[in-house]
């Protein structure tokens, strides 16, 4: 071996550097593939403007790049430059390998370490038909009463915890048939302590309110999907889609549809699209259809300096999903993600933004959506949706329950003979 090294020292050093560079590349690839497979992670690679997640991909190529640069230098008389680059390649291989394995271990272990507190919540199984109670509203019988909030962001000091608690107390007092939390319940999805803080407050303030949370992009961070399922989707639960992240809920008076859109369409694959179209196509034409998601569709907003894409009128969601909503006559789409409250309308489909459940408000919109009809900025609150036999009544409430804005949507089913598809409302 010594003779081999002495006679072929450069070739041996080159092979050694190559082997370690390939190990580093393999470890880096394994880490990125695992991370990319997690719910919501694809959005980080697409939306992050800091290059952090691009660096996570490219760092695996660094050792090979340094080794490649050393090859032409082997032809010059002085061997020191090529030797130095091979040394840098070896060192970077070790560092990249350690970083990749460390990140991989964190992604696997962090959301699985620690115990979630036992929560006293009235979680709703999406597979079970929702029963509703009746109540008079302006001399009309309310057939279904929903409350909706989003972007509570437990775990960050940027959230107004008093406003969040006030909103929950107002919802508890309203006693809805179902309370939808549309995501970003916590700031960092892999943090057990943040989930426990959320579960503690929810258990204390809305323990008896029927609850159905969706997963937002912050909830999904770094493997947060596992804690989301532990907290809000017990093993005994099931759904018509087979997924805990998107499903429909049948009621006597409405079809409720929850989508998995943490950032945008990164998780809106063929399976979810096919399921969605089938649900909408076969929906009872005598019932209104209400769709819920975390990320928005039409919305006012701004250009966020920390992001690589416009934070308004969603450039992915609009072309991918709004034609489906219009084709099948969806009545109302409710989303969070933007920290405003806003009501919009486009092609006779109504959209509500409700991302104001205590988290720091987004700045005054630099871009006002052409679809916008009303907006409240720097105002905390939630939305109540009351369904009567003729109308969907959408009430935007402030943190103390005062009505800020109200919309009445008359839902008209398709009565075309022989057609199961719904048509847009007149």
Task: State what each model feature region is.
Residues 146-148, 179-181, 213, 291, ...:
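Residue-level marker for buried hydrophobic side chains located in beta-strands
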Residues 178, 219, 297-299, 360:
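Feature marks short, surface-exposed loop/turn motifs that line or immediately flank catalytic pockets
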């Amino acid at each position: 071996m010594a003779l081999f090294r002495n006679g072929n020292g450069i070739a041996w050093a080159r092979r050694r550097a190559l082997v370690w560079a390939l190990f580093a590349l393999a470890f880096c690839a394994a880490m990125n593939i695992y991370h990319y497979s997690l719910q919501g992670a694809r959005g980080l690679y697409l939306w992050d403007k800091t290059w952090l997640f691009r660096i996570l991909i490219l760092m695996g190529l660094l050792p090979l790049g340094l080794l490649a640069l050393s090859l032409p230098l082997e032809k010059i008389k002085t061997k020191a430059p090529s030797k130095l680059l091979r040394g840098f390649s070896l060192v970077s291989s070790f560092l990249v390998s350690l970083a990749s394995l460390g990140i991989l271990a964190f992604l696997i272990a962090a959301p699985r370490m620690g115990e979630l507190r036992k929560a006293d919540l009235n979680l709703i199984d999406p597979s079970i038909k929702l029963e509703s109670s009746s109540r008079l509203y302006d001399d009309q019988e309310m057939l279904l009463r929903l409350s909706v909030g989003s972007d509570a962001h437990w775990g960050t000091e940027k959230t107004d915890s008093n406003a969040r608690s006030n909103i929950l107390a107002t919802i508890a007092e309203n006693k809805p048939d179902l309370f939808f939390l549309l995501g970003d319940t916590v700031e960092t999805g892999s943090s057990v302590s943040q989930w426990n803080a959320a579960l503690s407050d929810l258990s204390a303030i809305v323990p008896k309110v029927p609850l159905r949370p969706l997963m937002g992009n912050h909830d999904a961070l770094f493997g947060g999907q596992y804690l989301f399922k532990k907290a809000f989707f017990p093993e005994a639960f099931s759904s018509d889609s087979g997924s805990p992240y998107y499903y429909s809920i049948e009621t006597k008076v409405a079809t409720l549809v929850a989508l998995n859109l943490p950032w945008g369409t990164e998780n809106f694959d063929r399976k979810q699209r096919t399921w969605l179209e089938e649900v909408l196509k076969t929906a009872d034409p005598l019932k209104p259809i209400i769709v819920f998601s975390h990320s928005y569709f039409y919305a006012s907003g701004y250009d966020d300096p920390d992001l690589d894409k416009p934070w308004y009128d969603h450039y992915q969601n609009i072309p991918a999903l709004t034609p489906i909503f219009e084709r099948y006559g969806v009545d109302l789409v409710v989303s969070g993600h933007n920290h405003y409250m806003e009501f919009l309308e486009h092609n006779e489909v109504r959209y509500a933004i409700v991302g104001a459940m205590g988290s720091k408000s987004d700045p005054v919109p630099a871009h006002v959506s052409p679809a916008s009809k009303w907006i409240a900025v720097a105002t905390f609150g939630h939305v109540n949706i009351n369904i009567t036999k003729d109308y969907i009544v959408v009430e935007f409430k402030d943190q103390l329950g005062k009505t800020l804005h109200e919309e009445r949507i008359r839902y008209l089913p398709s009565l075309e003979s022989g057609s199961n598809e719904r048509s847009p409302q007149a």
